[in-house]
Amino acid sequence: MSFDQLNVIETGGGIAGPLVGRALRDLGANVVKLESRRRLDFGRTRVPPPGKTSEHVHASPSVHDLHAGKASVTVNLKTELGRTIFVDMTSKADVYVDTYAPGWLERIGLSYESFQERNPQLIILSQSAYGTMGPKRDQRAYAPIMTALAGLESTVGYQDGRTVSQVSSAVGDLV
């Protein structure tokens, strides 16, 4: 199958999920970005352009870059209608990308097995901070936490020992 025949559903937030969706879109895939109207992708208010404030939803240049070429649909997965729409869309998709914490989909009545029953060919890419297995799987984390744990925070600062607040980019989302 060529990329232009690939249908992707993306619910990933921040940078990691949208970056995967953007890469697949750049290769020709049809990507649909799903997000809640009540809890927008937090990347939408990240670093607004000059003269704008974080209240200018969608103003972030990175959001324009990461969401370029994607269709966008708002769905509330906490409602029956929202879950029905989501299940219908993933039943017809080739790839599903999310950045939910492990167990979140199960808590709203969806599971890996339910995806596979409806669509055995569906490729699921679930990106959480600590993975879906292991002792820290239920812990949430964002770039500053992960860069500190990886030791990257020790690489920024000044020769006299003063530090800066954090590594300046979400490097963990980009690798």
Residue spans for each PLM region:
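N-terminal helix-loop segment corresponding to the beta1-alpha1 unit
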Residues: 1-175
